[in-house]
């Protein structure tokens, strides 16, 4: 079924409850979902609360309905009902969007909650079929237990593979194995009219190109096909507390960057900056002895004490889970909730002056604010990075030429009111990093979205040189912009056009 193109029509009767179901449009939508037997979370129940409470409680949005499918035909039926009634549709996998895009990034969406579709099946040839609702920890455990195989992905086990793979998929072995989307061989996608299509390099190849970097703008990916690789026998995780001060930090950062230009692909790492100081941590695909040898050219220049943890692949995954006792996360599963703001940048190498400005800002403005902020500077590129191998135009992921990824996060607990100066703090940090670059020299990672960007700013920064082609493909596969959020790709002929309102309503989007 997953390789057929078909139109799903209404099925058996069921029952559905919707938000504000007091208008003709909402009543028609409710009836459509009911007639099609689409499972729905009921408002006022613990299930509704779980599905609609965002990871980032600073940005809370109210869906019109939450569909909880267990099979692809139910996704298609729900999408058909939404299209008929002019209701925008958003997929939600693990629900870890920093800007609540899994809830639509605005009120009034039909949310397709995919976490009941989490099956992972490994074939004898090493390929895997993974449903989009599977969490990364579950994917890692299943691939390893079924055949000692692995997939390159991020390190938070609760993140859903759906959005992670759709926009990139960076993790602590990515310089060796590339991004998650680099291992995608095919996908099964529900389009705006309820049609189910199979896409790959040979079938619907333009759609396949688009979903590897901008997937949420084009349909609901129900299932991915991935190539996998033999799980490494040894992965060595490490950390170094750096005894840097405002005077020594710029030279240390520059030395680290210089080392990273030619460091082996087996090594992926980051500088982590907090009010307490700087640390260097990462992972090496190999044993402890090989890691120590690889770090020799660096350690004498940056100082600090090296601590290591050697283990197998699943021990690597557990190490980065930061104390979570269970990485094999399946439903019902809830997320930690924070009130936060994130921003970031993908950039070329930085100059000595830029690192000086970076360190000065940390030592003055950032420290004085007292916010619970953190900054990560990941190594994305380099001479031996697998991420840098493909061309910018090979997939919709547009940042193959970038060397560094920066991520800024500022948070408080949900019970606290988020301080408004946190937004300014993040923007000021990003500006210090990017002000020396011209337009097009830097970008942003769509999996670390910035809620403060306008639609146009976000699209240019997330997709860069690939945006124009994405807009053309959007016009072909989603001409009426059903799959949308405030920062998603718009169809070429409709880039300056307002989305259609719900029938019988006038909504501001």
Swiss-Prot record:
Signal peptide annotation: 1-21
Pathway: Secondary metabolite biosynthesis; terpenoid biosynthesis
UniProt GO molecular function: FAD binding; oxidoreductase activity
Span of domain FAD-binding PCMH-type: 59-231
Glycosylation-annotated residues: 125, 193, 281
Induction entry: The subglutinol cluster is highly expressed when mycelia and hyphae are transferred to fresh media for a 3 hour induction period, remaining expressed under conditions of heat shock. The cluster is repressed in cultures reaching stationary phase or in early germinating cultures, as well as under conditions of UV, salt and oxidative stress.
Domain of life: Eukaryota
GO biological process: terpenoid biosynthetic process
Family: Belongs to the oxygen-dependent FAD-linked oxidoreductase family.
PANTHER family: BINDING OXIDOREDUCTASE, PUTATIVE (AFU_ORTHOLOGUE AFUA_1G17690)-RELATED, FAD-BINDING PCMH-TYPE DOMAIN-CONTAINING PROTEIN
Stated name of the protein: FAD-linked oxidoreductase subF
Annotated source species: Metarhizium robertsii (strain ARSEF 23 / ATCC MYA-3075) (Metarhizium anisopliae (strain ARSEF 23))
Gene that encodes the chain: subF
